[in-house]
């Protein structure tokens, strides 16, 4: 199995709290992005202290209460399945704070991390504040929910977005990359993809490759998998009959999403 592909686990952290994914610097090729997925039973709680990191708590499914012990946001979360296709609530917590999560119902939560030293206010990112975009045409159509885009100054380095791709379509396509710290032409951003499929037995294909092919991995990605993108192009293809959801987390030295298309395939934009 590719070292860029992670399968879901079910490691019990405490009563009612299971760690599904943990991508961190020490177990990946990433230097900026870290990522966790937790499953919480009703009434269970999870706490964590942040040092030189900021975190976006995304209520993927179910309802939770989140707190930084100064502000508390009760009963947040809007959906039982990501395929209800409506935005959800999230909470931004800055560095040097402690946060807690309590599950009101059965819940799945994503924790998205990046470096931060300039403490910013804790913020509830309401579902209705997510910017919704429809991108692409032909067989390259997808719907985007912007949770923490680069136009929102609420975070220091973290970018978070949800993407839905229809049956038979491609996403992150034409293949693009953001692995050069060369603004204004291109920014350096690492990235993770947390994938879900509808129906759940489906799969998508994701290729991660660089110009020199020092990275060139094509993966069969199943429901609940995570793909790590330390560098390179990273398109996703969705087979007929299935709908793709993924949660993207990006971070790098500058909080700007400026990508570069693969010149071999950029011609499709001219159709």
UniProtKB/Swiss-Prot annotation:
Class in the EC hierarchy, top level: isomerase
UniProt key word Metal-binding: no
MF annotations from Gene Ontology: 5-deoxy-D-glucuronate isomerase activity; glucuronate isomerase activity
One of the Pfam families matching this protein, by short name: KduI
Annotated pathway: Polyol metabolism; myo-inositol degradation into acetyl-CoA; acetyl-CoA from myo-inositol: step 4/7
Keywords, sorted A to Z: Isomerase
Domain of life, source organism: Bacteria
Annotated catalysed reactions: 5-deoxy-D-glucuronate = 5-dehydro-2-deoxy-D-gluconate
Sections of the chain in a coiled coil: none
InterPro entries (alphabetical): Deoxy-glucuronate_isom_IolB, IolB_Bacilli, KduI/IolB_isomerase, RmlC-like_jellyroll, RmlC_Cupin_sf
EC numbers: 5.3.1.30
Alphabetical list of SUPFAM superfamilies matching this protein: RmlC-like cupins
Any one biological process term the GO annotation gives: inositol catabolic process
Claim: Iron is one of the keywords in the record: no
Matches recorded under HAMAP family: IolB
NCBIfam families: myo_inos_iolB
Protein family (similarity comment): Belongs to the isomerase IolB family.
Protein name: 5-deoxy-glucuronate isomerase
Source organism: Bacillus licheniformis (strain ATCC 14580 / DSM 13 / JCM 2505 / CCUG 7422 / NBRC 12200 / NCIMB 9375 / NCTC 10341 / NRRL NRS-1264 / Gibson 46)
Protein encoded by which gene: iolB
């Amino acid at each position: 199995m590719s070292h860029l592909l992670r399968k879901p686990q079910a490691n019990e952290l405490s009563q009612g709290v299971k760690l599904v994914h943990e991508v961190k610097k020490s177990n990946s090729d990433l230097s900026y992005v870290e990522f966790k997925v937790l499953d919480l039973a009703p009434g269970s709680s999870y706490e964590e202290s942040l040092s030189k990191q900021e975190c976006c708590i995304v209520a993927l499914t179910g309802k939770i209460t989140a707190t930084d012990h100064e502000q508390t946001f009760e009963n947040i979360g809007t959906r039982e399945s990501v395929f209800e296709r409506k935005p959800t609530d999230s909470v931004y917590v800055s560095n040097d704070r402690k946060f807690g999560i309590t599950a009101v119902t059965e819940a799945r939560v994503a924790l998205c991390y990046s470096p931060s030293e300039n403490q910013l206010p804790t913020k509830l990112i309401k579902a209705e504040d997510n910017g919704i975009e429809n991108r692409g045409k032909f067989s390259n159509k997808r719907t985007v929910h912007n949770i923490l885009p680069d136009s929102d100054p609420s975070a220091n380095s973290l970018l978070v977005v949800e993407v839905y791709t229809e049956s038979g379509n491609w996403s992150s396509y034409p293949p693009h990359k953001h692995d050069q710290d060369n603004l204004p032409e291109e920014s350096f951003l690492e990235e993770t993809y947390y994938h879900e499929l509808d129906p759940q037995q489906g799969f998508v294909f994701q290729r991660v490759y660089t110009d020199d092919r020092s990275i060139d991995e094509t993966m069969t990605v199943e429901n609940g998998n995570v793909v790590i993108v330390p560098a390179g192009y990273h398109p996703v293809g969705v087979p007929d009959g299935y709908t793709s959801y993924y949660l993207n987390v990006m971070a790098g030295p500058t909080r700007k999403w400026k990508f570069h298309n693969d010149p071999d395939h950029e011609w499709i934009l001219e159709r």
